Amino acid sequence: MLPLIIFVLLCGFYTSWNIGANDVANAVGPSVGSGVLTLRQAVVIAAIFEFFGALLLGDRVAGTIESSIVSVTNPMIASGDYMYGMTAALLATGVWLQLASFFGWPVSTTHSIVGAVIGFGLVLGKGTIIYWNSVGIILISWILSPFMGGCVAYLIFSFIRRHIFYKNDPVLAMVRVAPFLAALVIMTLGTVMISGGVILKVSSTPWAVSGVLVCGLLSYIITFYYVHTKHCSYISDTPKKGSLTYRLKERGGNYGRKYLVVERIFAYLQIIVACFMAFAHGSNDVANAIAPVAGVLRQAYPASYTSYTLIRLMAFGGIGLVIGLAIWGWRVIETVGCKITELTPSRGFSVGMGSALTIALASILGLPISTTHVVVGAVLGIGLARGIRAINLNIIKDIVLSWFITLPAGALLSILFFFALRALFH
């Protein structure tokens, strides 16, 4: 038993590492592509907020993947076979992610793990131990998530263009709107944090809601003060190399001075959104690596398994994700940030806000949606607002194709690893 437990923990760390190396690009890639963050800054921000997102909210999605796809108590499935199956699903996910990262394929982590769990469920019970209703709900969420992300991003960007960029004085319009946008981001994040999680131990009490409102008010006041300072509207003709203004001029040299002021304000808002996006992504996707580990430990040590065991596992997975991000994450971050479509801070803000709202809502509801689906949907929403020619359709085709390949690939690898593990440890 102990060798299997050690092996599944190693597989959990390995898969978390690959999630960090591959999937975190969805959180901070737009910020790098728009020039708001350097690659190093993006990695640091993502590492911090991904870890705390996994620790504070990841337990909800972990519960969905662990026990809501296959029947743990079904008499057709032996305890040992369930542990072999979950370990096989975990290993299949890690191997497929690493293979995809090697070839630069933008695959879905959630597709892989859910497909892998379904794969060993088909082998053990010929489909009878799988909760097909739960699988159907998950599939519906995968279909809805890109539309939700796209619609929200489209509405946000359309609002920005109509009420800021199309005005006679876009700087004055931005000064009026920016405090409300900042308050929206902060209040949304606060709402997510009080809505769930094992560690926070807070609920939607009047005090908690009041705290969120106070944070939103403070963000409004701080932003209001900033946009009325001289520093906000000052644009140096020779900005310091490496500074935010320098990067924005380098990425979009045809900006007029007024539009550069507006985009720089959006740049600061996009940093807030990037933090929110990383937090939401960590709360949703680390569960893909930890849920099978939790399932094995629950079967092996039912008496000693508690909610705090899951907390420690989420922290363990968060560490693996951070290490994978730091070592190999730069590859996919550059791909997502620079190759799908041309991004500016205002567009990146719209993409990030639409994606973050969708992913955070899914985590609260316990739906293991695909972050890739949400981000691609948000980018498509921005593209539709600007015109279809603004989108790199070849990249979109590759992403959509990967959605169809990943789920069966996860299932097939899981089946192969299941028989190998049962032969090795049985």
From Swiss-Prot:
Where, subcellularly, is it found?
Cell membrane
Q: Which GO terms describe its biological process?
A: phosphate ion transmembrane transport
Membrane topology per the record? Multi-pass membrane protein
Instruction: Give the Gene Ontology MF terms in alphabetical order.
Output: phosphate transmembrane transporter activity
Is Glycoprotein included in the keywords of this UniProt record? no
Statement: the UniProt record of this protein carries the keyword Heme:
no
The alphabetized UniProt keywords are: Cell membrane, Membrane, Phosphate transport, Transmembrane, Transmembrane helix, Transport
Q: Which GO terms describe its cellular component?
A: plasma membrane
One Pfam family it belongs to: PHO4
Where is the chain membrane-spanning?
1-21, 42-62, 87-107, 112-132, 137-157, 180-200, 207-227, 260-280, 313-333, 364-384, 399-419
This chain's function reads:
Potential transporter for phosphate.
Per the record, the similarity remark reads: Belongs to the inorganic phosphate transporter (PiT) (TC 2.A.20) family.
Q: What is this protein called?
A: Putative phosphate permease CPn_0680/CP_0067/CPj0680/CpB0707
Its source organism is Chlamydia pneumoniae
